[in-house]
């Protein structure tokens, strides 16, 4: 999330107002980061809800109360119910630490992704920014960035490099493209419109 805050601060995310951070974990460090940046914080504590449906409903209610136009999953590893996905169709951006469709879907999150990447001996990994759907890591792909795997990589060193070289770059860029209304969704494909230059 810090990459989004920094990119917004330095004007790299255009036409966007970081209106709120909603955390499902009252102990999340993201809360402190958001407060330090002056971003309003709301907690919808997942642990107090009996099931996914009730948690999803509470989260949807909060998003609608705040009149959010875009939702970004930043470190959010929980598959939400269909009611929120449908209400925000093509308006939820997720970042995944692999080149989808490889090493993605149920069970592939956090360090597990990088462990699987190394176990399979692939030479290149990376990150994918995509629209979230009801199926994990299956939505239209907005941006991808490759990261070379080094001989001495461990899951942790690879995780760090994928974050620094890919995730922290393409997630703010995907948000900016959305806010500039430059994304055209055509089925499973996302096309990016050319940037309009006022000075030309």
Question: Over which residues does each language-model region extend?
Answer:
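One-carbon transfer enzymes
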Residues: 1-200
